[in-house]
């Protein structure tokens, strides 16, 4: 099993798909990395030589923010928004959608389960 950026890549997957198991690398970035390394995207991870794995490791470490560094950067950005109390920061604090979605009917993922409000019965 190839280990790149602290992630064990699945041996039976194609390299193009296997690299997407690393946080911060999607299909497009994966293809760009493989083009820079000169590796065929259809190759299976188990068929990579040690030299090719080291080359991939070097390219990812040099050119891309991945895994822990990227998670830390995102968390710091959100923390900064909260500290300066801008609109987006306040939405993060309140647990509401940040990117302008409507909240009258949907947004259950951010708001959590519905809290039913009781009503007094008429006599």
From Swiss-Prot:
One of its GO terms (biological process) is translation. Keywords: Ribonucleoprotein, Ribosomal protein, RNA-binding, rRNA-binding, tRNA-binding. Pfam families: Ribosomal_S13. Residues 101-123 have a biased composition (Basic residues). GO terms for cellular component: cytosol; small ribosomal subunit. The keyword Ribosomal protein applies. GO terms for molecular function: rRNA binding; structural constituent of ribosome; tRNA binding. InterPro entries: Rbsml_uS13_C (IPR027437), Ribosomal_uS13 (IPR001892), Ribosomal_uS13-like_H2TH (IPR010979), Ribosomal_uS13_bac-type (IPR019980), Ribosomal_uS13_CS (IPR018269). Residues 97-123 are annotated as: Disordered. NCBIfam families: uS13_bact. Belongs to the universal ribosomal protein uS13 family. PANTHER family: 30S RIBOSOMAL PROTEIN S13/40S RIBOSOMAL PROTEIN S18, SMALL RIBOSOMAL SUBUNIT PROTEIN US13M. Located at the top of the head of the 30S subunit, it contacts several helices of the 16S rRNA. In the 70S ribosome it contacts the 23S rRNA (bridge B1a) and protein L5 of the 50S subunit (bridge B1b), connecting the 2 subunits; these bridges are implicated in subunit movement. Contacts the tRNAs in the A and P-sites. Part of the 30S ribosomal subunit. Forms a loose heterodimer with protein S19. Forms two bridges to the 50S subunit in the 70S ribosome. This is Small ribosomal subunit protein uS13. It comes from Alkaliphilus oremlandii (strain OhILAs) (Clostridium oremlandii (strain OhILAs)). The lineage of its organism: Bacteria, Bacillati, Bacillota, Clostridia, Peptostreptococcales.
């Amino acid at each position: 099993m190839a280990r790149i950026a602290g992630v064990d890549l699945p041996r039976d997957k194609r390299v193009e798909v296997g690299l997407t198991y690393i946080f911060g690398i999607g299909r497009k970035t994966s293809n760009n990395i493989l083009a820079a390394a000169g590796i065929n995207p259809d190759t299976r991870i188990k068929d990579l030589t040690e030299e090719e794995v080291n080359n991939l490791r070097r390219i990812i470490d040099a050119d891309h923010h991945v895994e822990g560094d990227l998670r830390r950067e995102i968390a710091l950005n959100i923390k900064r928004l909260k500290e300066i109390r801008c609109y987006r920061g306040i939405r993060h604090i309140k647990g509401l959608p940040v990117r302008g979605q409507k909240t009258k009917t949907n947004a259950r993922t951010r708001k959590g389960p519905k809290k039913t409000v009781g009503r007094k019965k008429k006599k």
